[in-house]
Regions:
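Short, conserved catalytic or adaptor-binding loops enriched in Gly and charged residues
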Residues: 28-33, 127-129, 154-155
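Generic hydrophobic alpha-helical segments
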Residues: 53-61, 84-88, 181, 185-192
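Active-site catalytic motif of lipid deacylating hydrolases and related acyltransferases
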Residues: 1-69
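Serine-dependent carboxylesterase/thioesterase catalytic core
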Residues: 2, 57-151
């Protein structure tokens, strides 16, 4: 089972369309052939209840014990500095890794709101927990705040670390970031899911599921 977690930035919400929502639509289009039982996409705001979300992923793993669980995270701005960091910490409680994170101009978020002025000075860097196994990143040096290369607790480097000529508020819509997220997703789906007719063992029975398995496509 492949879970793709998207995390939006600190000025973004459901009230206005943004680049992370557009990325979700692109991924849904690219993955349309796959069963939504096997490939699942989530989009949450940076300040979401990451403890509950991590527990939901753990419960999915328990619900389908024969299915290896793989998590990818695509995050922007505070979606990196808060969302990705907190999700990884909570997933670690359940022994779940994030196989790959692809980040766009990730910004450090201090636990105390007045501490966030240090972000402007550029003296704080995001530290990603060791269960974030690999990171690919994009950043800009055109406007403040600027994303800095995160530190990985597992000792690895963010690779590649690519500079883009956009302002911070435009980085969620970066075509380069979107293309990389799509490529990472498609590679993982091909490698891990097995095929468009693949569904988790012990999935609830239905006529639609039988049709997918027998015909190799949606009814």
């Amino acid at each position: 089972m492949l879970i793709i977690q998207l995390i939006s930035g600190f000025t973004q919400s459901e009230k206005a369309w943004n680049g992370v929502q557009e990325l979700r639509e692109k991924l849904l289009s690219e993955l349309d052939d796959y069963s939504s039982l096997s490939v699942r996409i989530r989009l949450d705001e940076w300040s979401a209840n990451w403890r509950a979300i991590a527990r939901q992923m753990y419960m999915l793993r328990e619900r389908y014990p024969q299915e290896p669980l793989t998590v990818l995270v695509f995050a922007y701005s505070w979606g990196v500095g808060n969302g990705l960091v907190r999700l990884a910490r909570q997933l670690n409680r359940f022994g779940i890794d994030i196989e790959t994170a692809v980040i766009s101009d990730g910004v450090y978020r201090h636990w105390f709101s007045l501490g966030n002025w240090r972000v402007i000075l550029g003296d704080r860097r995001i530290v990603l927990p060791a269960n974030v196994l690999s990171v690919q990143g994009f950043h800009q040096e055109t406007s403040y705040p600027m994303g800095r290369q995160p530190l990985l607790a597992n000792g690895k480097q963010c690779d590649p670390w690519t500079k883009i000529r956009l302002e911070h508020v435009e980085m969620d819509g970066s075509r380069d970031w979107h293309r990389r997220c799509i490529r990472v997703t498609k590679d993982a789906a091909t490698r891990l899911v097995g095929g468009i007719t693949s569904v988790p063992a012990a999935a609830p029975a239905s006529a639609a599921l039988d049709s997918r398995i027998s015909n190799g496509s949606e009814p």
